[in-house]
Amino acid sequence: MLDPTSERDLFDQENMEEISQLASLEMSGDVVANTNSTVVLEKPSYPDSVYVTAANIFQGIRIQRSPDKVIINYGSEPLQPSSSRSEDESFQRLSYELAFSTLKYQDILESILIDSYIFSSTTIASQLNSLIIVMLYDFQDRKFQPRILSENEETIPEVQEVENLLNGFKTKLAAALARCRIKHDALSIYHILPETVRKQEQRASTLPLYAWINTSKISLEEVYNNLRRKGYSKVKSITSVNEKVYAVDQHCFNVLIFPAHLKTDLLNIDLIKDYKLIFQDKSRSLAVHSVKALINIDDDVLMVNTGSWYTVAHMSILTSGHTSKIFVCGIQQEEKDFNARKLFTRMGCQNIEILHETFLSIESKDHRLQNVKVILLLPRCSSLGVSNPVEFILNEHEDKSLLQDLSQGGLPKDKLETLVQQQFEQLTHAMKFTKVQAIVYCTCSVSKEENEDVVEKALEYQSSGVKMQPYRLSPPVLPLCTLKEIELSMDRFFRLEPSDMNNGCFLSILTRERDPSETVSVKDVLARAAAKGLLEGVEVGKTLKRDKKRKKSKALPSRAPHHGDPLRDHLAVDGNDTSNVQMKISELLHRESKISTSTKMSAPAKTVSQAGTSSQVRKPSKPLSTPLVRNFSRPVERPTNFVRARPEGKVIPLKPIEIVLPPVIFPLSSQGPRVQMPATHFYYRFIGSKVGVPRYLTSSTSRRKEKVKESTTSSHVRHPRPWL
């Protein structure tokens, strides 16, 4: 029988082996391959200042319970953070990531603390409870290994006190953790999380980095060359995560994609430091590129709820070659105004106008916005399509209170309804601007209530408003690169579902129906084409001048055509000058009648002595009433000149149509007119046709020819019909 000391040592050893064997003590959820191994890879530890800042963040976003269900009292006084690095961006990101991870496991960590009797065994101030739970998460994530600090690292007394407490209860905490895992029948505490949260973590671990190129400071080719010199290779798609590669996005020409593991390396290159390459979520680039496709070179844009200043800068840079202005509203604090203008100057943005009013307080007839043609609306949303909420909320300056709901996999119904109402109010207010022609509505949510329902409700609501041309739903202006994207856009909405390659995104374009009384000028068409880059090397001003000259030339009398082709000659004649055309036709037919008469007198004798019945056809005593017979009898008189000038006026209705018809379906009877057809017709009338395959004219063509002939002075004048 073992003594109490040996029994305690054996219990400690068994617990430590279980801790080292199970990946439940890792948040990745993977089981250790070798269950007998006790080798544990060290994970970098956080400095004291990160723990304190993360504890204060957790204190503000933690899930608060009703008084009868309170497990741990967290106090109300925040800890004093270190002021040396509190404003550092990387420091803030580490603190928020630690606080958000703790928030996801709040229920589990609280159960472990209660089950280990740590609070009943010690007396510790309640204001340190937030620090305890944050450090416990990191402690078990590192498999209860001691933290290693650098020599010059600043130490905080409260952090040292809590660390000593957790090390003293290491065995009991490990045992409580194992019991919690067994209770939920889970391989790890990671599998206790809701499925939506687990999928979110999996996507976040592989989500690539998106960065757009600031073309006001550097060209695309210069960026490619710079990256190549630093060892990066350009590929078509990001498939390998272990190499220094990048790809160009298919939807946005100035957006590059990098594997996630390259972020630390990229942050140290000059392209990032000099604002030539900007990290930002792809959804924001999709929004600004949609606006770019809708505006002319002199149209202004109004941006609402932009969040990050990078979105405003991106819109400004895409329109840097235009005379457009980019209006951004809602910057009310002077400090934010100063920081925003400073950033815009560094990035080379020159066409941004800041409005201090909120969007809903701006009148639709504001004189400053009379040239605004497109509104970009990025409303506050639930961000349920985002895989890494911390990264997105910090970069886009979104509401940090959303982290509490996103840690549990979704928003409560009442919060979602509040967001939907705000989105509807902003969209309907945007529709009131009379000069605006299009609205781009973009969210990072996958909730139908925030996307399709809001847009459709706003479209229905507009009918009861002011009498203006209504808005309608327009198809996406972005390229659809895959079959799945095409299927998702069948209802005229652009969607990206959350995946390992991108966050979720919803984008809708509303365009005002064109007033039927208004006509689109050439200037507008050319301006739109120039804005889309379709007129490279062509100056719009010169094009407009050429167009004016063409209009003047049309007003002058039509000149004689010089093409030698009847159809092109007809197109060169003004269709309104009917009298001039008729006069030319009469002159031409009169001239050809003389030529035809002289030709008839000089015809060879052998032509007359053809078939016996052919001479009857040429008797001018009485013209045949059948148009087909008359048309076919006329070619016997072979014209002497095939390059004679051709008539202009009524040529277009007489455009020949060649149809090969078998003799058995000839429209006339088998006797009579067909017997009278001259045999010579098949040899010299249609040069180049195959022998034995005659070509006939349709009856409609013959009737048209007869009408032209009847307009002449003589009924038996036979001209060679040069247009056939």
From Swiss-Prot:
Where expressed (tissues)?
A: Expressed in testis.
PROSITE patterns this protein is in? SAM_MT_RSMB_NOP
**Where does the record place Basic residues bias?**
543-554
Question: Does the UniProt entry include the keyword Methyltransferase?
Answer: yes
Q: Where is the composition biased (Basic and acidic residues)?
A: 562-572
Q: Which GO terms describe its biological process?
A: flagellated sperm motility; methylation; sperm mitochondrion organization
Positions of the UniProt region annotated as Disordered:
542-574, 595-629, 698-724
Q: Where is the active site?
A: 444 (nucleophile)
Gene3D superfamilies noted in UniProt: Sun protein, domain 3, Vaccinia Virus protein VP39
Q: What happens when the gene is disrupted?
A: Male infertility. A mutation which results in the conversion of codon 333, encoding glutamine, into a premature stop codon is detected in chemically-induced mutant Ste5Jcs1 mice; these mice are characterized by sperm motility defects and infertility.
**InterPro entries linked to this entry:** MeTrfase_RsmB-F_NOP2_cat (IPR049560), MeTrfase_RsmB-F_NOP2_dom (IPR001678), NSUN5_7_fdxn-like (IPR049561), NSUN7 (IPR042620), SAM-dependent_MTases_sf (IPR029063)
One term of GO molecular function = methyltransferase activity
Keyword terms, alphabetized: Methyltransferase, RNA-binding, S-adenosyl-L-methionine, Transferase
Q: Where is the composition biased (Polar residues)?
A: 595-618
Write down the EC number. Answer: 2.1.1.-
Instruction: Please indicate if the UniProt record lists Methyltransferase as a keyword.
Output: yes
Q: Name one Pfam family in it.
A: NSUN5_fdxn-like
- Role noted for this protein: May have S-adenosyl-L-methionine-dependent methyl-transferase activity.
- Entry similarity comment: Belongs to the class I-like SAM-binding methyltransferase superfamily. RsmB/NOP family.
**What is this protein's name?**
Putative methyltransferase NSUN7
* Biological source species: Mus musculus
